[in-house]
UniProtKB/Swiss-Prot annotation:
Entry's localization field: Plastid, Chloroplast
Organism the protein comes from: Oryza sativa subsp. japonica (Rice)
Interval spanned by the transit peptide: 1-64
Superkingdom: Eukaryota
PANTHER family: GEO12009P1, THIOREDOXIN X, CHLOROPLASTIC
Function noted in UniProt: Thiol-disulfide oxidoreductase that may participate in various redox reactions. Possesses insulin disulfide bonds reducing activity.
Name of the protein this chain belongs to: Thioredoxin X, chloroplastic
Site positions (Deprotonates C-terminal active site Cys): D91
Major location category of this protein: plastid
GO molecular function terms noted in the UniProt entry: protein-disulfide reductase activity
Keywords: Chloroplast, Disulfide bond, Electron transport, Plastid, Redox-active center, Transit peptide, Transport
Family: Belongs to the thioredoxin family.
Length: 180
């Protein structure tokens, strides 16, 4: 015959973690979670999780097939953008910018879709204040198209954008040959 759980004077069972049951709750003994998976969705997460010595935290990268969008800085701007044989779409972004993260998949798609016709680079707003000032970037994300080392008139675009609107924005700019 099984005995019923003990009760207190009020007739109720003691709270599950009270010493009345003879067990004590130990820190760290409550819940042990397995480590996070090595992949998220269809992408494999790679890259450092912590800040490098003396530097800012670097966001994890997503590994994809096709063209990659590179981050460049002030020192690479002239060679990568102004001296490029291809038109270059510069995406000014910041890691704290929500709309920048929203359009990142669209920009990645465009790098693959227009590979060979267009180069796309990203510039970190916080790490490149001279470029931000020189090109008068007031909102994020900001897109500016450069051809033959000059900004294409009417190519500036600020804010999040859908893939369809991105194509509507980019196609006419790639077909024109006018520069400022």
């Amino acid at each position: 015959m099984a005995s019923a759980p003990s009760t207190t004077a009020s007739g109720l069972a003691p709270p599950p973690f009270s010493s009345a049951r003879g067990a004590r709750l130990l820190p760290g003994a409550l819940l042990r979670l397995p480590p996070p998976p090595a992949s998220v969705g269809s992408f494999r997460v790679v890259g450092p999780a912590a800040a490098p010595p003396g530097g800012r935290r670097i966001a994890s990268a997503r590994v994809r097939c096709g063209a990659a969008v590179r981050f460049i800085g002030q020192s690479e701007f002239e060679a990568e953008v102004l001296q490029s044989d291809l038109p270059v779409l510069v995406d000014f972004v910041a890691d704290w910018c929500g709309p920048c993260r929203l359009i990142a998949p669209v920009v990645d798609w465009a790098a693959e879709e227009y590979e060979g016709r267009l180069k796309i680079v990203k510039i970190d707003h916080d790490a490149n204040p001279q470029l931000i000032e020189e090109y008068k970037v007031y909102g994020l994300p900001s897109l500016i198209l450069f051809k033959d080392g000059k900004e294409v008139p009417g190519s500036r675009r600020e804010g999040a954008i859908t893939k369809a609107k991105f194509k509507e924005y980019l196609e006419p700019l790639l077909s024109t040959s006018t520069v400022a």
